């Protein structure tokens, strides 16, 4: 039976799940601009109140992937995305962006998907620009830089132009919707391994199961007990691990990896410029909470990418490339590559 926007809204009002294949039909209609703004807003608000299910999220993500501009990475060995939903409200420096250079220096290939800031002080695109990189690389160029250097950034508006269809509605609504959790699920390089931070502990298991439905090989979905969408230094972190087709949940703490507990205030910034300075201090090997949190998250990325045997081994590899300058070298090479005349 075909799923119309009206039928979908009726399902939602009655607190019934929209089946995954029905969600695929619905999202295709939305992405093809066949659904009015009023109906889109009603469906998005209703899903938020009802709470989106694994099948609904997976169906919506499937369609967003269909409509994306793909990045074809030839050698997919140890290919990983380090990504977060954002929206945790903590305004920390760009931990995952820093971690991508560390993970690449230690042997992973990082295909990072991101955007400018909406609610934080500095989005991944903002800090990369502050570092001097060009963020507007086309899909072929992103594949090339990943192949040459081991790291690439996919600027969401370039790879998901169809999102312009729903942007006015989302902007006017001004609240979180399913689209806030779809972005990290729609990596244009189809990275088979994912380290994903989420802003809500309830999403840890949900997103891990969604990634399984979407065909991910390995994933770590993390949320600090303080609400941080990274592995946190301030408290324990809830982890949902997808491996071998199964999801298990557990907790880790900074002390597990020889790190001191540290308040999030030590990691907060007010602008992309401040985030840039903190990121450069970390890549210079300056000890402290910022370096620790980057090593922790890069270590998790190296584990999920299959480079490290476990998170602790990954942390050790991350510290090594931070202290010997290899991580900073990856950043410098990346910026230079993206600024070549044909990319500007």
UniProtKB/Swiss-Prot annotation:
Molecular functions per Gene Ontology: anthranilate phosphoribosyltransferase activity; magnesium ion binding
Cofactor: Mg(2+)
Gene3D superfamilies: Nucleoside phosphorylase/phosphoribosyltransferase catalytic domain, Transferase, Pyrimidine Nucleoside Phosphorylase, Chain C
Amino acids binding anthranilate 1: 84, 115
Keywords: Amino-acid biosynthesis, Aromatic amino acid biosynthesis, Glycosyltransferase, Magnesium, Metal-binding, Transferase, Tryptophan biosynthesis
Principal EC category: transferase
Residues engaged in binding anthranilate 2: 170
Subunit structure as annotated in this protein's UniProt entry: Homodimer.
NCBIfam families documented for this protein: trpD (TIGR01245)
Family: Belongs to the anthranilate phosphoribosyltransferase family.
Name under which the protein is recorded: Anthranilate phosphoribosyltransferase
Gene: trpD
């Amino acid at each position: 039976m075909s799923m119309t926007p009206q039928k979908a809204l009726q399902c939602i009002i009655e607190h019934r799940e929209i089946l995954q294949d029905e969600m695929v039909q619905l999202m295709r209609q939305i992405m093809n601009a066949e659904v009015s703004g009023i109906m889109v807003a009603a469906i998005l608000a209703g899903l938020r109140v009802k709470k989106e299910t694994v099948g609904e999220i997976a169906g919506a993500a499937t369609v967003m992937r269909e409509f994306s501009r793909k990045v074809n990475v030839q050698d997919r060995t140890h290919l990983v995305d380090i990504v977060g939903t954002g929206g945790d409200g903590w305004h920390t420096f760009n931990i995952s962006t820093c971690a991508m250079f560390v993970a690449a220096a230690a042997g992973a290939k990082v295909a990072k998907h991101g955007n400018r800031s909406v609610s934080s002080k500095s989005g991944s695109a903002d800090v990369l620009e502050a570092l001097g990189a060009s963020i507007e690389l086309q899909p072929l160029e992103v594949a090339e830089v990943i192949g040459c250097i081991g790291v690439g950034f996919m600027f969401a508006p370039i790879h998901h132009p169809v999102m312009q269809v729903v942007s006015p509605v989302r902007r006017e609504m001004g609240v979180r919707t399913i689209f806030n959790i779809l972005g990290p699920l729609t990596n244009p390089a189809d990275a088979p391994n994912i380290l994903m931070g989420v802003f809500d502990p309830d999403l840890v298991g949900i997103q891990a199961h969604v990634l399984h439905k979407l065909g991910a090989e390995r994933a770590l979905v993390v949320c600090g007990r303080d609400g941080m969408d990274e592995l946190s230094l301030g408290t324990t972190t809830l982890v949902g691990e997808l491996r071998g087709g199964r999801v298990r949940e557990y907790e880790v703490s900074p002390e597990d990896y020889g790190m001191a507990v540290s308040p999030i205030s030590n990691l907060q910034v007010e602008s992309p410029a401040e985030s840039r300075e903190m990121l450069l201090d970390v890549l210079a090997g300056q000890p402290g909470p910022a370096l620790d949190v980057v090593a922790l998250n890069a270590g998790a990325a190296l584990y999920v990418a299959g480079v490290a045997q476990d998170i602790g081994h990954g942390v050790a590899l991350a510290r090594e490339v931070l202290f010997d300058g290899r991580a900073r070298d990856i950043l410098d090479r990346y910026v230079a590559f993206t600024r070549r005349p044909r990319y500007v």
